[in-house]
Amino acid sequence: MLWKANVWVLGEAAHGISGGTIIYQLLMFIILLALLRKFAWQPLMNIMKQREEHIATKSTRRKNDRQEAEKLLEEQRELMKQSRQEAQALIENAASLAEEQKEQIVASARAEAERVKEAAKKEIEREKEQAMAALREQVASLSVLIASKVIEKELTEQDQAAS
């Protein structure tokens, strides 16, 4: 019964299996394989090869892009490092210039204070000399006045004694 079912499935239920049909079917299968190879398999393999090349190209490009990005990142880091160093140098330079200016301003202020002090001393000395001269003049005037009074008194006493 199994044999009959298998034969019926193959389409040969009423007849026996013919050798010519098998050869014809085998020949058609080989032709089908050849046609599939030429028109389907080869183009499919070409597409697969192109896809593989495309993926390899993308992978290579991605790898190159990654390397370039890493290189640019390293360059940026180096530039940032240089910028920080330059900024630090500018800050240090500005600090030293500020210190120099501070010292110059302090020195200038000290010199100005010394000049003002010397001018004040000279002014005090001049006023002292003027006061001394005025005092001498006043003492001389008073001395003359006192002397004239004393002389006048002596003269009047002598005049009185003589009279």
From Swiss-Prot:
Which InterPro entries does the annotation name? ATP_synth_B-like_membr_sf, ATP_synth_b/b'su_bac/chlpt, ATP_synth_F0_bsu_bac, ATP_synthase_B_chain
Prosegment location in residue numbers = 1-11
| Matching Pfam families | ATP-synt_B
Q: Does the keyword Secreted apply?
A: no
User: Where in the cell?
Assistant: Cell membrane
Transmembrane feature ranges: 16-36
Q: Which GO terms describe its molecular function?
A: proton-transporting ATP synthase activity, rotational mechanism; proton-transporting ATPase activity, rotational mechanism
Write down the membrane topology.
Single-pass membrane protein
CDD domains documented for this protein: ATP-synt_Fo_b
Q: Name one GO cellular component term.
A: proton-transporting ATP synthase complex
Record's keyword terms, sorted? ATP synthesis, Cell membrane, CF(0), Hydrogen ion transport, Ion transport, Membrane, Transmembrane, Transmembrane helix, Transport
Subunit comment: F-type ATPases have 2 components, F(1) - the catalytic core - and F(0) - the membrane proton channel. F(1) has five subunits: alpha(3), beta(3), gamma(1), delta(1), epsilon(1). F(0) has three main subunits: a(1), b(2) and c(10-14). The alpha and beta chains form an alternating ring which encloses part of the gamma chain. F(1) is attached to F(0) by a central stalk formed by the gamma and epsilon chains, while a peripheral stalk is formed by the delta and b chains.
Described by its record, this protein's role is as follows: F(1)F(0) ATP synthase produces ATP from ADP in the presence of a proton or sodium gradient. F-type ATPases consist of two structural domains, F(1) containing the extramembraneous catalytic core and F(0) containing the membrane proton channel, linked together by a central stalk and a peripheral stalk. During catalysis, ATP synthesis in the catalytic domain of F(1) is coupled via a rotary mechanism of the central stalk subunits to proton translocation. Component of the F(0) channel, it forms part of the peripheral stalk, linking F(1) to F(0).
- What does the sequence similarity comment in the record state about its family? Belongs to the ATPase B chain family.
Mind telling me what this protein is named? ATP synthase subunit b
Gene name for this UniProt entry: atpF
